[in-house]
Amino acid sequence: MVIFSTGFNYKTAPVEIREKLAITENNYGLILEKLNSIEDIYEICVISTCNRVELYGVSNDNIEKVKEEILRILSQYSTVPVNTLKDYLFFYTNKEAIRHIFRVSSSLDSMVIGEPQIVCQFKDSFTKAKEYKAVRHILTRLFDKALNVSKKIRTSTGISRRAVSISYAAVLLAKKIFGDLKDKNVLIIGAGEMAELAAKHLHSLNVKHIFVSNRTFEKAVELADKFSGSAIRFEKIQEFLPEADIIIVSTGAKEPILKKEDVKRAIKSRKDPLFIIDISVPRNVEESVNELEGVYLYNIDDLKQVVNSNLEERKIEAQRAEFIIDEEVEKFVKWLNALKVSPIISSVRDYADKLRQQQLEKLFKQMPYLNEKERETIDLAMRSLINKLLHRPTMYIKDKAAKEGNTEVVKIFEDMFSSKWDFRKKGKNLEEIEDIVREEQ
């Protein structure tokens, strides 16, 4: 059994690749079902945000086959060739996979360390995977632990104090270029979480007015009302462009919303520069817009510079958080390693119990005069003897399994009994392990 984490994020793949891999709400179930149908995968969960498309799962030891199948499915979905995806794919197993998952849930792997959005996104991805019955007991345990680690880090370090989001980074970039924003009109296209965060930060800087547009007009009205703004119908965006000084685009559209010709017409009646920040993935503003004079277009990857300038004060707290991660990873790895030998121990105990039953049956035939109470006393004595005999080797093998690098002793223990039972049957280990995890929970 192998725990793995794989995928593409802002560190490994540019936005041009990530936007093609981004999994929409409508496609999520289809992709998850395809991944879950891979024979070598036992459990799978997918998280798709503007900064990452990642898969966390449990599989058998055939890792290369797992990687190959994942790439094939993602290539079909994104239309990006497998060989191209290979260049940007990361793939971690076991200890490093667990570490990565803990770092993601704790926002230590985020573009903006300490940003809170990832926790909700992490929970949502797990909830969806549960709905599609793609996760079972191992990933459930891992995700619960990851969220506990995240909470521990947020409460015991200052990692989330003054934490900035991508939306806030966008606002800081606007402030850096314009200086005072009090006389600036802002158009926000989109009404989701990122758009609302941007509106919140802009409102706190006393911009002149906030306009909100969304395909669902009611959502635009709802968001605009929160910040004393105005809602604009989606089909009227082009008419309003000349009035906007700052445009922040954050939608889930698959095609560009703002095109070069639209912006070109808008700037003809403007004297001041137009500042556009596209924090959507896929990008919602045509890249060629940046060719227009007086127009400044930035996408989500451009925000890295703004983000990096705000990371210094979090470095010390991040180091403290990494120590917590290291500690919790070791605990989980020990639990997992000990768990892996549980089917072996269970089979050994089953073998011992069958021997007990055989010997009792033989004994009772030889001593038919024993009454029920006497038989129960003998049975109890044999059970007690077996438990005492197996206790020390069981604890020894669990301890050796929990410590990395002690697989030889475990292998010897397994081989001693493998002639009686095949521990390597497909699915047998997983089912027994899950039973044990279920009992612990």
From Swiss-Prot:
Q: In what pathway does it function? A: Porphyrin-containing compound metabolism; protoporphyrin-IX biosynthesis; 5-aminolevulinate from L-glutamyl-tRNA(Glu): step 1/2
Q: Which Pfam families match?
A: GlutR_dimer, GlutR_N, Shikimate_DH
| Chain positions recorded as NADP(+) binding sites | G190, A191, G192, E193, M194, A195
For this UniProt entry, the molecular function terms from Gene Ontology, in alphabetical order, are: glutamyl-tRNA reductase activity; NADP binding
Q: Which gene encodes it?
A: hemA
Q: Where is this site: Important for activity?
A: H100
Quaternary structure and partners: Homodimer.
Does this entry carry the keyword NAD? no
Keywords carried by this UniProt record: NADP, Oxidoreductase, Porphyrin biosynthesis
Chain positions recorded as substrate binding sites: T49, C50, N51, R52, S110, E115, P116, Q117, Q121
Homology family: Belongs to the glutamyl-tRNA reductase family.
- Its job: Catalyzes the NADPH-dependent reduction of glutamyl-tRNA(Glu) to glutamate 1-semialdehyde (GSA).
Judged by the first EC level, this protein's enzyme class is oxidoreductase
What's the domain remark here?
Possesses an unusual extended V-shaped dimeric structure with each monomer consisting of three distinct domains arranged along a curved 'spinal' alpha-helix. The N-terminal catalytic domain specifically recognizes the glutamate moiety of the substrate. The second domain is the NADPH-binding domain, and the third C-terminal domain is responsible for dimerization.
Catalytic activity field: (S)-4-amino-5-oxopentanoate + tRNA(Glu) + NADP(+) = L-glutamyl-tRNA(Glu) + NADPH + H(+)
Can you name the source organism? Sulfurihydrogenibium sp. (strain YO3AOP1)
Set out the biological process GO terms recorded for this chain's protein. protoporphyrinogen IX biosynthetic process from glutamate
Tagged with keyword Oxidoreductase: yes
Q: What is its EC number?
A: 1.2.1.70
- What residues make up the catalytic site? C50 (nucleophile)
What additional remark is attached to this entry?
A: During catalysis, the active site Cys acts as a nucleophile attacking the alpha-carbonyl group of tRNA-bound glutamate with the formation of a thioester intermediate between enzyme and glutamate, and the concomitant release of tRNA(Glu). The thioester intermediate is finally reduced by direct hydride transfer from NADPH, to form the product GSA.
This protein is called what? Glutamyl-tRNA reductase
